[in-house]
Amino acid sequence: MTARGWEDFSNLLDTYEALGLKADEALIRQYIQHEKIAEDFSAYLDLYYKYRDDYGVEEILAGQARPAVFARLLNAPFDERLSLVSLLLSGLNNRFTASRRADAAADACYAFLREAKQGFATLPDDIPDGPATLFNQMMTDYDAETRRQREAGLLSRDALATRLKVYAVLRQWEAELRRAKAAGTQEAFDLLRTQFQSLSDERDAAQEAAASALEAAFDFMEQAFAESQEMVVFVTELTLAPAAHAFITENGCPRYFQYNKDLLLDHRKAALQQELAAEERRHGGM
């Protein structure tokens, strides 16, 4: 499968999950031609769906873990416990990604709004529908640039998603401009600024959803695993995942920083003990 094929397949799986649907082996075979790999991937997905539903991952990330979950974990094998940790990380990563995309879209729309303000300043107030017409032309140029970059292969998956989101928002703003029939450029800009506030609120909501889920995940991890190997894996993966690292760096998470610090100290302590043991062996052999 090509890189583009994997991207399309990943997008499809994300869409299925958002709709509450499950991808079966027949669907997987449309993207993965190798029979054994398709079977293995299908088996992995089945296990993923099973643990996700059995443990109620979304409930855990909402801070509403069922008591039965903790009872089941007491007798669960290590690989099953790690699978649950992986599912929690996947759910968090989806929220971190959504927050990052909402942030990127808001930033891009803000930059577009500033350009529109500069353009409006050059328009005489007596031109009928002038702001809406200019805004439409700016939108057309933005869409054309997106198409050009996409065809040239210059856009990453995230960059393309952001530009498509921005264009969808701009179309809504243009519709509001035409509906309001703003009499002047200042009135038109004030309307757009009000529209931007809704987008800013959407960004704040995505950030809050991710932060809340992260806190709920730590609550669950502490109650279910304390400072065991599962917690080590959880914190380590948060450190290694780009979306998680970026979100935590920007928004903070005291418990993450504390656990990460403790893990670093434990690592240094273990390394020192190994050095001391090696030194003792060298002296013992003299």
Set out the residue ranges of the language-model regions.
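Alpha-helical lid/collar subdomain of P-loop NTPases
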Residues: 1-141
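Charge-biased C-terminal accessory regions appended to nucleic-acid-, cytoskeletal NTPase
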Residues: 86-286
